[in-house]
Amino acid sequence: MSNILDGRELAKEIKERIKKETEILEKKPRIDFLYFEDDKSTEVYFTRAKKQAESVGMIGSLHNLPVNTTEKDFLTLIEYLNEESETSGIMIQMPLPKHISKKKVYETISIEKDADAISHVNLGRIFIGDSNLAPCTAKSAMALIEKSGINIEGANAVVIGRSEIVGKPLAHLLLQKSATVTIAHSKTKNLKELCKNADILCVSIGKAEFITGEYIKEGAVVIDVGINVLEDGSLKGDVNFEEASKLASYITPVPNGVGSVTVSMLLDNVLYLHKNIINKK
């Protein structure tokens, strides 16, 4: 039976450290959350994130925008917050409404206030080895891998998923630790074979319980990034937990795994950005 990598424990450790660091700051970090009123799940997530920010001494500000907000007005708001001296970090709803260009948002947000490291420059920094600022979900997954205690150097790591905010940055974070990394996706033909050879298996594909025990190498560390809501309202990951946990040495549950750490990593990013702004003055 696997050891469980409980994200709640790691999140608590991170927030305790952030709170201590924030307490000694004369000016407190502020994070601005931008989202649209029709996205209720993001509203719930950002409201909780705001409360957690305030619990560690930060300031949170919610921007609940009308659905018909134009792309121009949305980009103008980002530009305003880029210049707003009270704002330390900006967190933007993803995915965006269809009428707003993701590319333009990535290009508009200031690299100095990019709380989820989605700008082209900040993503590029990860690719050249700078991991101080990384997308929150990828950073959370990496922290849980490290918490398992596995020797990452030389390990075979398979990342299933190639998104800009999870799969690709997570692969580069693993590369920085000298893992041998394979990125798999929906077009990968020998997926089961690749997974069976993985010492570290990270899954982010958005398909409930897609990865069964047949994909798991005995003793592997399994990181399940997926969160899928079933018809009965229950939450399931991309990995069949019951089957995988019989083979893996360490595994993240869903819920209470990677998702439990993401807000703490967001706050960690905001604190990092805030300190950089202070140091430049």
From Swiss-Prot:
Transmembrane segments: none annotated. NADP(+) binds at G161, R162, S163, S186, I227. Gene3D superfamilies: Leucine Dehydrogenase, chain A, domain 1, NAD(P)-binding Rossmann-like Domain. Its EC number is 1.5.1.5, 3.5.4.9. One of its GO terms (biological process) is L-histidine biosynthetic process. SUPFAM superfamilies: Aminoacid dehydrogenase-like, N-terminal domain, NAD(P)-binding Rossmann-fold domains. It holds the Pfam family THF_DHG_CYH. It catalyses: (6R)-5,10-methylene-5,6,7,8-tetrahydrofolate + NADP(+) = (6R)-5,10-methenyltetrahydrofolate + NADPH; (6R)-5,10-methenyltetrahydrofolate + H2O = (6R)-10-formyltetrahydrofolate + H(+). Catalyzes the oxidation of 5,10-methylenetetrahydrofolate to 5,10-methenyltetrahydrofolate and then the hydrolysis of 5,10-methenyltetrahydrofolate to 10-formyltetrahydrofolate. This is Bifunctional protein FolD.
